[in-house]
């Protein structure tokens, strides 16, 4: 404790000079802060923080004493200026007194001079008042005269029926003159007569508007008929243009160079654009000439009467009633379109759309009801055509007809079902009237109507007449029915809002051909075909139908506006395949029955004879005579491919019949001569096949011989030196692949040499056996082991 006190004393002694300099610094800082207007708070806090406020007070007092001298100098300077200013004011006092006396003298002189002028001014004011009253009287008289002139002019306009000008005169009187009219009598007269005049004008205009409403009903009916007729004429022109285009395409397809070119002149009419002009009164003598002047006049007058909104509602209500009662759609909405565009707001677009929606809803309901009751395709098509024409007519004016077209599309299936039913009846009648005779055409127009119109010709060369066609009358009759079906289907599908409808037409065309025509032909074949000639004619007809079906699909694509290459790309198989196969099978079956009649002569063949028939057996000669006669007749009717299929089937049947006879109970034993006789018979069949060279190519002739390959291989096996080779798989596959081992075993057993039998061995014991017989015995043994 003593040492620390000693250190403090030393510090205070040595820092005496430092404390004085610190006080001077604080004094300068406080002076500077006061001069600069700074905050003295930090100094105050510091002073009280150290516990020595006397120092701060000392500094503030010192600063105040230092500023007293400055204050005294400033006060002395301003005191001298104030003294000088007081002296200057005292010097001006005498001048002000002299000015006051001068002003008093001037006022006295002015009063003496202005007294006469004031009396003259009073007289002037009195004269001006009198003049003003006279002017007011003249103005009142002039006002009354102008009012009477307007009244007279209004009466003249009322008498001449110029109601608008009469109302303008009345409005002018009411707005410009009536409040200013000085005559109370005249004013009361105007107040009583103006409402009466307006009421009179309103009654007259309403009567004219009522007459127009009655007249526009008749105009709408005629206008609708005219619009539908024009749309129909435009559609007819389009159809004619399409026909010309088809003819040009046909000429191009046939490479005809002599073509005729013509300009297509299109008539510009008011229906084409749907905008007939901007004249609010009438159409100016065009196709849509109807007068709207009474309507617009009534609307204008009601606007003048400030009843425009009332008249709008009145007009809308009356037109709504007319639409509901008359239901004249086309003409009604053509008129409304004109009123919308030229009526100056008489009816709004929303109101027209509301009327249209009402009409469309009612039309759709009526169409749904009528379509559900219809049982005739023609009636449905007529209504569809009319509705589509209505849609075309009103679409030009911007009305949405999609709902109507959707109703038509919804009944597309029903229409086609009815159309299929009608075609089924027509096809049945056409087939029942068929006499199964080739069609005779005496004139070129008959050829064009029955052959060229359906592209049934096989050559571009026109034949000589009379011409006998390979088909019967049922072919062109059915073609006409199918073509009519296609055209009716396209007519229903076109002009209905759907652009790509070929697939729909094709679907129903497939049904017509695959269900209706095919089933009718199958029924005809099963019930009415009783002879070879009839079956041959039906088979020939089927071949022609195959070409006709190609035409049907091309025709449908053409009418639908689809390129032929796309239609060919989507083609399927021949839709009449069932009836075609049935017709050929029926023909083959009847021919087989005929052949079976000749094959009964196989019973007369001596199968154990040792003599070889040089010219073949009797049955084969009869069969060949019949086949040659058949071919010569069939070549004139049947196409080559059909005749080939039928002949192949018949030849295969002959082969099966011979093999069946050899394997049957009729033949107990076979001799070598009998087998060689069969070989002669088969050679005759080969010759017959080879003689068909104009009909068959060499390749086709070889294919035709495969029809009797079974009997040929059987004969070759029996005539071979080593029949045992049949059991060799390689040789069998190469030379005997058509033979059945059971049939071979049966025939080989019958062909065995009787000397090799059990009872024949006694006479030949010890002699050498024939190698062929030995091979045959081995074959029989091997086949028995297999079985």
UniProtKB/Swiss-Prot annotation:
One biological process term in Gene Ontology: pollen tube growth
InterPro entries according to UniProt: EXOC6/Sec15, EXOC6/Sec15_C, EXOC6/Sec15_C_dom1, EXOC6_Sec15_N, EXOC6PINT-1/Sec15/Tip20_C_dom2
Keyword annotations from UniProtKB, A to Z: Cell wall, Cytoplasm, Cytoskeleton, Exocytosis, Secreted, Transport
Subcellular location: Cytoplasm, Cytosol; Cytoplasm, Cytoskeleton, Phragmoplast; Secreted, Cell wall; Secreted, Extracellular exosome
Positions of transmembrane segments: none
Superkingdom of this protein's organism: Eukaryota
Record-level GO cellular component terms: cytoskeleton; cytosol; exocyst; extracellular exosome; phragmoplast; plasma membrane; plasmodesma
Subunit architecture: The exocyst complex is composed of SEC3, SEC5, SEC6, SEC8, SEC10, EXO70A1 and EXO84B. Interacts with EXO84B. Binds to EXO70H1 AND EXO70B2. Binds directly to B1L.
Similarity-based family: Belongs to the SEC15 family.
Function in brief: Component of the exocyst complex involved in the docking of exocytic vesicles with fusion sites on the plasma membrane during regulated or polarized secretion. Involved in polarized cell growth and organ morphogenesis. During cytokinesis, involved in cell plate initiation, cell plate maturation and formation of new primary cell wall.
Name of the protein this chain belongs to: Exocyst complex component SEC15B
Annotated organism of origin: Arabidopsis thaliana (Mouse-ear cress)
